[in-house]
């Protein structure tokens, strides 16, 4: 054991994964960190393996994916693992963010950790979008066309930026090549950001806890207690992932992407992967192109303002009934946006999308500060009696 505390590299591992003192009362909602690290690891390993057999060319991309599926030993397994772990990654990230919002993990002194986490989310979305283009099916081509075209909303220089991204006048071979290069690069950037996220948390006050108070009253070492606790959820994760990979590998995908990309034929509905749907719904709900793009980016960056807009004296909403109601309305609204993003742009969905978009942004900018001020006042009234 002594080498763990003296060796320059091993002592870092020791301080993060063995001796790290964690609050004794953290629940299973604090297990997402290890699960997300596992997801990133799986994605990098399967991604590099796929890259060994993939050809980033508009003529060969679709066929090279079919070659991976049919001819490469266990290629189908590697590809389905990659595709379904991507979904698992986002599902767990949304739960992780939800945990952070519920328990006030964004409040000082964890503001930096929260900010880095938001950057991680943005990089994840960029990586996922780039990866979705690579199989070069119908949804890949048209999804790439629609999303890259968003840049044309920027006044004056927009169209030039779009053509710069494309490397031509439409999505072409140059586009596919650069998307492949970036999709290969960004997961490593993501790994670096995840380390920064960990360091920012570790070097301030460590994990929070369900009570929202100091964790210093009762702590336990990370090993063996929390190693074992993390392993419980890791095994559950593998079981659920296996069910998807082996029994319904295409349940979360789009059948349209099994049709080779055809620039002459637009699919009936251009829909991104399920995990980007809420933001796609926000983008589509505003008729003005530029304002839609601004709203979509604002919806992601709104997480950054939580440390400023939450004016409550208490950390988290677990002991704040009004905030708890607001939080659950926000979650329900997010799920509604996810449904609307998959629908056609027609009458009931347009209006519903606009209401949901307003409610989503209002939660961060209006509802949270107003409700927290009301609760502060009620607490003061109750304590003065």
Swiss-Prot record:
Q: Biological process GO annotation list?
A: mitochondrial electron transport, ubiquinol to cytochrome c
> What keyword terms does UniProt attach to this protein?
Electron transport, Heme, Iron, Membrane, Metal-binding, Mitochondrion, Mitochondrion inner membrane, Respiratory chain, Transmembrane, Transmembrane helix, Transport, Ubiquinone
Membrane topology, record value: Multi-pass membrane protein
Name the residues that span the membrane.
32-52, 76-98, 113-133, 179-199, 226-246, 290-310, 322-342, 349-369
A GO cellular-component term linked to this record? respiratory chain complex III
Recite the UniProt cofactor note for this protein: Binds 2 heme b groups non-covalently.
Respond yes or no to whether keyword Transmembrane helix is given for this record: yes
Q: Which GO terms describe its molecular function?
A: metal ion binding; ubiquinol-cytochrome-c reductase activity
The UniProt annotation places a ubiquinone binding at: 202
UniProt-annotated binding residues for heme b b562? 82, 183
Q: Does the keyword Iron apply?
A: yes
Please tell me where heme b b566 binds in this chain. Answer: 96, 197
How does the record describe its quaternary structure? Fungal cytochrome b-c1 complex contains 10 subunits; 3 respiratory subunits, 2 core proteins and 5 low-molecular weight proteins. Cytochrome b-c1 complex is a homodimer.
Role, per record? Component of the ubiquinol-cytochrome c reductase complex (complex III or cytochrome b-c1 complex) that is part of the mitochondrial respiratory chain. The b-c1 complex mediates electron transfer from ubiquinol to cytochrome c. Contributes to the generation of a proton gradient across the mitochondrial membrane that is then used for ATP synthesis.
Mind telling me what this protein is named? Cytochrome b
